[in-house]
């Protein structure tokens, strides 16, 4: 059993990021030399000063006002927490951490996102954040999915509703295996 309530620590950290939108309060939930890496874009920071700069000028308060996170699952270990969620927003602002350099398109985005968070001494030590960047780029109109195995918003819908069809991107390959012995 973890020494600290990792879920409570993580939720306090997220409140500072998304509700109070306070970079100093966010940093106070972290170890002295933390790091955050949004893997698809390599956005974040290493060490207190670089990460505080990232939070203050490129993350906190820069997210679209309608951004919501729908929890899907949470796994808690002795020093780590893994959150699976769906992130929904309308692309009305420049989102440096997810879509660096891309001006607002006004389009809606729904994407599964996974946060892997490590804790040390009752504080957040680091975060690794993953999502399918191709699906995001398709949804904002920057990538044509024609002929590519990219699910777009359908991936988020499938996470929320496992009864939705699987293998839709397999096309003829999936149809060709129909009726074969299993």
How would you name each of these model-derived features?
Residues 1-182:
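C-terminal and inter-domain tail/linker signature
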